[in-house]
């Protein structure tokens, strides 16, 4: 019981960090509107920005957008098109509504907390639940995640795991614009067990810390975004063997203090974007 409570508290804390507005703002969070221009994703997913970002339409029959008060629903047009494709197909196959979490800020850039990536307009968090009934405005502003992983962290919780979660993740992975989908290792383990002979899509599904209630979907660099830095391809194979097993091995405690890291220099085009914005104020 104690372990279960710890798991619930950990999930709640994670959700609080992701949605907190009390942290000090970064310069990027002070820019309220996209920069006009031909859409261009610049830099890397964890050190970049975007010109010509577009807001995801907040009204759709197939998806709902959460925490709109935080204005994290901007992205490259390719990302908006992916969300439309995903939600349309998932609605057709499951009758459920896709819940869209954080995308990016109006010009991308670094968050003060919650995300290291989501900076170049090509990342989106999709919650791993598909409600048949539309959520109210209050539910969308204060969404309640469902922790799909049990207290041990070794397996999904069978009481809350649903087959349509596999459908949701697989549908996203089969999209040609998607390069990676980050989920909790226990969720990846469950997907490996359910996949059967059709396993190629599992290559894109990558185990990562947390991600107990949502998947983080990342798209490839758009062909015409010449300053976008592509991530290397995932390793060959379904990722269900030794690589996945390593996530469940006991971690050896380190005797060394963690090194303090400083953010890398911005790509020149992103620094210029910031400079122009604040010079005009």
Curated annotation (Swiss-Prot):
Main localization, broad class: periplasm
Requisite cofactors: Zn(2+)
Record key words, sorted: Disulfide bond, Hydrolase, Metal-binding, Metalloprotease, Periplasm, Protease, Signal, Zinc
Gene3D superfamilies recorded: 3.30.1380.10
Cofactor binding remark: Binds 1 zinc ion per subunit in the active site.
NCBIfam families hit by this protein: PRK09429.1
Protein name: Penicillin-insensitive murein endopeptidase
Organism expressing this protein natively: Pectobacterium atrosepticum (strain SCRI 1043 / ATCC BAA-672) (Erwinia carotovora subsp. atroseptica)
Upper lineage: Bacteria, Pseudomonadati, Pseudomonadota, Gammaproteobacteria, Enterobacterales
Gene: mepA
């Amino acid at each position: 019981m104690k372990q279960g409570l710890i798991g619930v508290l950990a999930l709640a804390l994670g959700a609080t960090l992701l949605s907190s507005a009390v942290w000090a703002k970064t310069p990027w969070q002070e820019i309220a509107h996209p920069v006009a221009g031909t859409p261009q994703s610049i830099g890397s997913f964890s050190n970049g920005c975007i010109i010509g970002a577009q807001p995801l339409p907040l009204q759709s029959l197939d998806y709902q957008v959460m925490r709109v008060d935080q204005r994290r629903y901007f992205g490259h047009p390719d990302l908006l098109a992916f969300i439309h494709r995903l939600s349309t197909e998932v609605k057709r196959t499951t009758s459920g509504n896709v819940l869209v979490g954080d995308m990016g800020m109006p010009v991308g850039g670094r968050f003060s907390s919650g995300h290291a990536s989501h900076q170049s307009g090509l990342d989106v968090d999709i919650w791993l639940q598909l409600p048949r009934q539309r959520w109210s405005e209050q539910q969308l502003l204060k969404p309640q995640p469902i922790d799909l992983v049990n207290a041990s962290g070794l397996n999904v919780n069978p009481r809350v795991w649903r087959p349509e979660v596999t459908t949701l993740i697989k549908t996203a992975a089969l999209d040609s614009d998607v390069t990676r989908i980050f989920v909790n290792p226990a969720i990846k383990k469950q997907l490996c067990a359910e996949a059967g002979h059709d396993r190629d899509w599992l290559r894109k599904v990558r185990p990562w810390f947390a991600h107990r209630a949502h998947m983080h979907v990342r798209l490839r660099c758009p062909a015409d975004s010449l300053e976008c830095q592509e991530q290397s391809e995932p390793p060959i194979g379904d990722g269900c063997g030794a690589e996945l097993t390593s996530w469940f091995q006991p971690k050896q405690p380190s005797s060394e203090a963690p090194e303090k890291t400083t953010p890398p220099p911005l790509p020149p085009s992103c620094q210029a974007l910031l400079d122009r914005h604040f010079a005009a104020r």
